Amino acid sequence: MAGYKPVAIQTYPILGEKITQDTLYWNNYKTPVQIKEFGAVSKVDFSPQPPYNYAVTASSRIHIYGRYSQEPIKTFSRFKDTAYCATFRQDGRLLVAGSEDGGVQLFDISGRAPLRQFEGHTKAVHTVDFTADKYHVVSGADDYTVKLWDIPNSKEILTFKEHSDYVRCGCASKLNPDLFITGSYDHTVKMFDARTSESVLSVEHGQPVESVLLFPSGGLLVSAGRYVKVWDMLKGGQLLVSLKNHHKTVTCLCLSSSGQRLLSGSLDRKVKVYSTTSYKVVHSFDYAASILSLALAHEDETIVVGMTNGILSVKHRKSEAKKESLPRRRRPAYRTFIKGKNYMKQRDDILINRPAKKHLELYDRDLKHFRISKALDRVLDPTCTIKTPEITVSIIKELNRRGVLANALAGRDEKEISHVLNFLIRNLSQPRFAPVLINAAEIIIDIYLPVIGQSPVVDKKFLLLQGLVEKEIDYQRELLETLGMMDMLFATMRRKEGTSVLEHTSDGFPENKKIES
Amino acid sequence: MVEEENIRVVRCGGSELNFRRAVFSADSKYIFCVSGDFVKVYSTVTEECVHILHGHRNLVTGIQLNPNNHLQLYSCSLDGTIKLWDYIDGILIKTFIVGCKLHALFTLAQAEDSVFVIVNKEKPDIFQLVSVKLPKSSSQEVEAKELSFVLDYINQSPKCIAFGNEGVYVAAVREFYLSVYFFKKKTTSRFTLSSSRNKKHAKNNFTCVACHPTEDCIASGHMDGKIRLWRNFYDDKKYTYTCLHWHHDMVMDLAFSVTGTSLLSGGRESVLVEWRDATEKNKEFLPRLGATIEHISVSPAGDLFCTSHSDNKIIIIHRNLEASAVIQGLVKDRSIFTGLMIDPRTKALVLNGKPGHLQFYSLQSDKQLYNLDIIQQEYINDYGLIQIELTKAAFGCFGNWLATVEQRQEKETELELQMKLWMYNKKTQGFILNTKINMPHEDCITALCFCNAEKSEQPTLVTASKDGYFKVWILTDDSDIYKKAVGWTCDFVGSYHKYQATNCCFSEDGSLLAVSFEEIVTIWDSVTWELKCTFCQRAGKIRHLCFGRLTCSKYLLGATENGILCCWNLLSCALEWNAKLNVRVMEPDPNSENIAAISQSSVGSDLFVFKPSEPRPLYIQKGISREKVQWGVFVPRDVPESFTSEAYQWLNRSQFYFLTKSQSLLTFSTKSPEEKLTPTSKQLLAEESLPTTPFYFILGKHRQQQDEKLNETLENELVQLPLTENIPAISELLHTPAHVLPSAAFLCSMFVNSLLLSKETKSAKEIPEDVDMEEEKESEDSDEENDFTEKVQDTSNTGLGEDIIHQLSKSEEKELRKFRKIDYSWIAAL
């Protein structure tokens, strides 16, 4: 025959953010360390080699920070004007940066003075990068040109003059030493090949391009302006998807170390994390100011975000919590379990399988044996009422369905009844629990009305409950008034007779509930 | 071509199984139970119905094994007869005509030639226990008029009579009295419960009685849940009783085990209680049997118990209180809210079943397929408790979706409402809960319908409610990157001037939705959810609403509470016709344009079948039932019939079933009930030696096929036989008067020979190719044969000899041929 059916606990949709593996992953950072820089932080770049230092470009300085240091371990400050886009070479030993005066400077990490200076741009250089062969530097400037420089003899190799507005972002391919990409305020992203003298591909972004990113495989291109757009390079620059999740210009892009997630920072003070398979937002970070730069350390260990107010926010991943092994309870010896395991079935033996035991919650066990008061006591325990009020409400509902709620509530002393009243006071006004709890409150009042006035503690609770109900009634009346006003507005706007639109309301309390005390 | 008789209303399936105690056969292989006018024989192992014993013309009220022959069964009926059956072959052996209504039957091993029955003779509510002497006679029908009175003024129910201690006494209870009649002394002792005079404790009246099989001990069950064990009742003064109390509600039935060591009791709690050694401490329970226990019976072998339940079910329970088999009929315990539906996949009838369940009932095999637990809550069976009721259900999208609505209303303002949507899972072959919606409406849901259009890409459900709204629910893709999920959400909410929405209905192609708001019918476009038009006849609230189908899809039909049936034309938006008809049930046929309407009048219910295109009905049958008809449904036939007559054409592709207020399921048929018996039930003739196990069905079937083959060959031979009549020898033998014929000994050989001859020629004709080979064989075997013939010649040198020898050789030949045939078949088999 069918076994005991456990009480169905009403589940309610959890409001707010859903807990997914992504939220768990991206929330697993310590509280951010804030470092004040001299000006807006325009670029943060991690060294690809251990110990994974990072370069922060702010105002006319470039600071190199160690991963866990809050003070810069090195500073490059020989810029006459604002520095831009300090970028590490793949081996982490060289650093290149552009500047407002049109110069491009190459530094050795250990040195102080620039190793090379590339002169040729006439206006501010906002983007520089090393090519994949490590011996060339690509730069883009506000004079609409993109230049390729040779590091050994610090000469200009090529100049592309295809953009018709400021070139503000760019990146070199990590696979092919000859390919690089630039994005410009003329709304285009262009791919250049150093072996030819002109661009090999151009895509129309639609807005000024603030940041570009090439996937490690080189197959996909991400460009950010007002929106983030993903382009398929292998199909000749076809638009794959347009992400419109930010409501202000997106200024920086970054890939997670696994390549599975794309991060974008925006002037709307948010960093969003997208899945690169479905291009859906899986997580979002909030920051205090508009974000200009963003970088992720190796293995996503650190997130560094630079903002317009010069604050650098550094978040470190929490170290894997080592679980303290609890002192193990003494269990029967292993031999007990293994006993008879390798017994072979003989011919005349009948194998009897033990039926799987169904685990029942304690309150279910009580209900199964019709111990109704005990079941109610169990769920009125403060640990249960605070953490999982829906269980308490479901048990009260079940007792009501069984017609024994009054019996279970009766015969309680001062302490127990104040437990019940505490629970009612906390949850009575919640619309999802109200229908069940109003009924329970009525029963309690009916039962304990004759003995009222004997305990000041309980009397106070009843008065509290009364005040709560009165407040709720006022609130509901106000809501109804608002609803009436809205109805009137809708009625004037309605075009057609007969059709109507339902207004969702939070009907909680029928007004005839009066709690007397 | 089916012979066209008149269409009759026939009761089909789902009759009660729990009317009386079930009876076990002596070897516990079979269990018998009364079921309407029949007695059903079930196997206790396979739960299959092995036989249906039909012969009574009225309700069967009692069955008992023949104490003198355990292979026979007595049954009594309200038609005034006692019948004796051979239950293994399902044959009626004898009928005893008593002549008055028999209400219960008892047998005693001690009273060999008589049985006890309960009759009411003078007044309608006074019942007597009488013994009937069954005369010994060879004829099929015997009059048994020899009645001797035993006890008067007893309860009608057989639960209130018990024979005890090998038939020494009989105990009967009624209200507050227990009377014991001793057969030897022919005296009656009467005991009254002391508290019965006291009005305060008036709840302890007797409900049932059982007697210990070997000791002088009577157990009686009471209304207040107590069981009293009476002893020493030979003395009116010194009698004692002890009380056993566990049940909190009425004790429905009691039974002692065969040895008498334990007592079984059951009641509304649906718990079987076993009291060991008649003490209150030693008790065992078998809980959660599903419904009120109505009867308990014990097998004579003592290894099985069985309980009959109010939900039309018999549970067979092992001695160690483990349920081993469930024989489930159509559940009829409770009122039917959901109406009758057809599951598009299994073609089973679907309706309310056990509390909180939907039952799937196969009409073809008259058997419950399964129960679907909808409410999924522990069922507390208690008097006066307001239960959650499953009020509405609908199938959609060819059986892929099932929507159910459950509600519980304690007070006017406190309504609990829940809608559940179930998806059919092909892997598990069952419905799985997909979406649960709490309070889909503010008030009761009055109607529920799926859009069943073939080309609809998105499943759509519409609910109409008393709160004045109808809501459209659609299946939406709720999946994110982590998991795939689909769920139902509300898509549109419509209302019309705050009237209560009472019915809703989709057109066949799903393009239009009709929703009735009290007196007004509104038509909505199902794509844009715009109100297209309204119809109003001011003839009372709309009770039923349905669209025409196929060629009549431009019509909309509505039946109102004031007894008007209206048909609107959707193209002209005008009333096409109306008729004065108090329609109770209106059901469209899914396979044709026909619509069946059942009207209710003071006399009874009438059936009208019509097409929406014309107001003149195709078929009218008056007086289909004296009761109110609650629900009806068209069930598509597996094999279409071919009635040519215009009046019966509506039955060609579908069959119409309806359910009356007393919950009997009826249908229309032209065949006689014998014809309607399914061949499956005939196949299940169990052989004595073979237990009816699943293996039996496999092997039995195989064997049956072999039997059929044999039969065929036999038939072939039988067909040939008439030809032999043409042979002059036989005709001479048969037509010559006996007194002029020579002696039989003389004729015999001639007769036999003539038969052999004819046979031989026949077979030769049949297998002409074999003839050559035969001849060859003959030549091969000729040496032997010659030897043989020579021998014969040696032994018998009579005048007649030659002829006989020749004949003998022929017969010899035939035998040889037979051997040869066997040889060949054997080679072929290699």
Swiss-Prot record, chain B:
Query: Which UniProt keyword terms apply here?
Result: Acetylation, Isopeptide bond, Nucleus, Phosphoprotein, Repeat, Ribosome biogenesis, rRNA processing, Transcription, Transcription regulation, Ubl conjugation, WD repeat
Q: What PROSITE patterns does the database record attribute to this sequence?
A: WD_REPEATS_2, WD_REPEATS_REGION
Q: What is its main location?
A: nucleus
At what sequence positions does the UniProt record place the cross-link Glycyl lysine isopeptide (Lys-Gly) (interchain with G-Cter in SUMO2)? 123, 427, 676
Gene3D superfamilies tied to this protein: YVTN repeat-like/Quinoprotein amine dehydrogenase (2.130.10.10)
Q: SUPFAM superfamilies, per this entry?
A: Quinoprotein alcohol dehydrogenase-like (SSF50998)
* Cellular compartments annotated: Nucleus, Nucleolus
Q: State one Pfam family annotation.
A: Beta-prop_WDR75_2nd
Q: Which residues cross the membrane?
A: none
Protein known as: WD repeat-containing protein 75
Print the organism lineage.
Answer: Eukaryota, Metazoa, Chordata, Craniata, Vertebrata
